[in-house]
């Protein structure tokens, strides 16, 4: 059957380029206005280290393999993609900005808010870095603080606290270059913690306070939400890969054997049932099989996972929102699948913890395709892609001159490739 070009308004494609895997997920809205996942493709990732492209050719090859799989399985041809981006080069800071308005008789409007936010994109950063997201936390009008939406109010001085996110220009451009060399068009770049949040969290969690912990292969992303606003983000430079390497070194086995052991028999906490349980590893080139104690395996995994969760908990505490996380912690990503990790996190943080699966907002018939937390980012990219299209339609109907001029100023910058719909809230 001839392949159909899917570059149309009905279908969204998400591309997740991770340290251990590249995955592509295709979705569309069904007749009930629910997102239906049509298919997915994945390939081993060999050109990415801790979220940063380290080898262009290898990364392109991995993307092409994922493309080939999803196109064959679904008999389609993909073109435009919403691309996830993460990595230890992503940084965040808190900043306060202000503007003084000329006429108090004219009520505060979107133009004033956009002007205030636009000033944040001009912040002086470290050479090679650029501001990619500006997320308002709360506004102050003539000294009156705690305002969530100042539109329609009267006032001269408009201030706001912002959560500002920066990225290395080179790292972002390398991601885009890989996507383009693989024959795809990067429609938008989306920070992966934001995508995972949309796929796994519900409205109550986003509103009442939650910490999303996305454990990938190379890094662990932390994103804190309260009142449906992103309050804090951080990147921990460790993920599931380092656990596998610890097992390899500690047990003197091959890396692929270590990964299989982690998946099949690994645990983040020791339990009595592990006593005297042994696993046999086949020997190489005629060597004798190696006996591995499951208890030893759990001790290795537990030590590293405790280190990662301690770093996560430190970020939660320094954010200032520890006491406000009424719904606790949600774990997702491939690294969250380690047995008993949920219990370890609850023990360390004394907070309710659950595993976040990427089926929170998709049609029931699609859930079997993306049951694993490893697909949270990919599903979230599809969901955010549809949200972006809806917001674009709304903006096209209500554009003002400032928005147009602002877009023109940013068009030559990396900012133009980043979605901006995180900057107000997550809904």
Regions inferred by a protein language model and the residue ranges of each:
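Nucleotide/phosphate-binding catalytic cleft detector across ATP-hydrolyzing
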Residues: 1-21, 25-212, 229-230, 240, ...
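Short glycine/serine/threonine-rich phosphate/pyrophosphate-binding segments
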Residues: 22, 197-198, 208, 217-223, ...
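Glycine-rich phosphate-binding loops at beta-strand->alpha-helix junctions
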Residues: 85-86, 167, 267-269, 324-348
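Glycine-rich phosphate-binding loop of actin/hexokinase-like ATP-binding domains
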Residues: 208-250
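Feature representing long, continuous alpha-helical segments
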Residues: 245, 299, 303-310, 314, ...
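Flexible glycine/proline-rich, aromatic-decorated loop/lid segments
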Residues: 277, 352-355
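Glycine-rich phosphate-binding/hydrolytic loop that grips phosphoryl groups
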Residues: 356-402
């Amino acid at each position: 059957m001839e392949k159909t070009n899917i570059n149309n308004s009905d279908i969204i494609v998400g591309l997740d380029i991770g340290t251990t895997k590249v995955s592509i997920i295709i979705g569309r809205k069904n007749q009930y206005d629910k997102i239906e996942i049509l298919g997915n493709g994945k390939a081993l990732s060999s050109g990415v280290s801790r979220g940063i492209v380290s080898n262009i050719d290898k990364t392109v090859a991995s993307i092409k393999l994922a493309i080939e799989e999803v196109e064959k399985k679904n008999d389609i041809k993909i073109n435009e993609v919403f691309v996830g981006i993460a990595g230890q080069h992503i940084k965040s800071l808190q900043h306060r900005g202000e503007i003084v308005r000329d006429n108090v008789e004219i009520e505060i409007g979107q133009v004033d808010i956009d002007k205030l936010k636009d000033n944040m994109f001009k912040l002086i950063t470290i050479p090679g870095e650029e501001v990619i997201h500006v997320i308002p936390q709360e506004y102050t009008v003539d000294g009156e603080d705690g305002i969530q939406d100042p539109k329609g109010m009267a006032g001269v001085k408009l201030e706001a606290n912002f959560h500002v996110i920066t990225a290395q220009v080179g790292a972002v451009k390398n991601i885009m270059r890989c996507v383009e060399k693989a024959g795809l068009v990067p429609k938008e770049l989306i920070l992966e913690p934001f995508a995972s949040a949309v796929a796994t969290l519900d409205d109550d969690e986003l509103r009442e306070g939650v910490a999303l912990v996305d454990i990938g292969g190379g890094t662990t992303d932390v994103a804190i939400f309260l009142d449906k606003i992103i309050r804090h983000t951080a990147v921990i430079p460790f993920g599931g890969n380092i656990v596998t390497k610890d097992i390899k070194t500690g047990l003197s086995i091959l890396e692929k054997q270590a990964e299989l052991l982690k998946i099949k028999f690994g645990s983040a906490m020791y339990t009595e049932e592990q006593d005297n349980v042994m696993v046999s590893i086949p020997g190489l080139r005629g060597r004798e099989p190696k006996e591995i104690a499951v208890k030893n395996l759990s001790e290795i995994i537990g030590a590293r996972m405790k280190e990662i969760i301690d770093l996560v908990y430190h970020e939660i505490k320094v954010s200032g929102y520890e006491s406000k996380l009424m719904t606790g912690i949600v774990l997702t990503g491939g690294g969250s699948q380690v047995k008993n990790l949920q219990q370890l996190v609850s023990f360390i943080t004394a907070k309710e913890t659950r595993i976040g699966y990427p089926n929170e907002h998709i049609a029931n018939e699609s859930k079997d395709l993306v049951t694993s937390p490893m697909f949270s980012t990919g599903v979230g990219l599809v969901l955010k892609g549809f949200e972006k299209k809806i917001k674009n339609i709304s903006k096209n109907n209500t554009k003002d001159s400032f928005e147009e001029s602002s877009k023109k100023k940013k068009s030559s910058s990396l900012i133009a490739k980043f979605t901006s719909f995180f900057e107000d809230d997550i809904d």
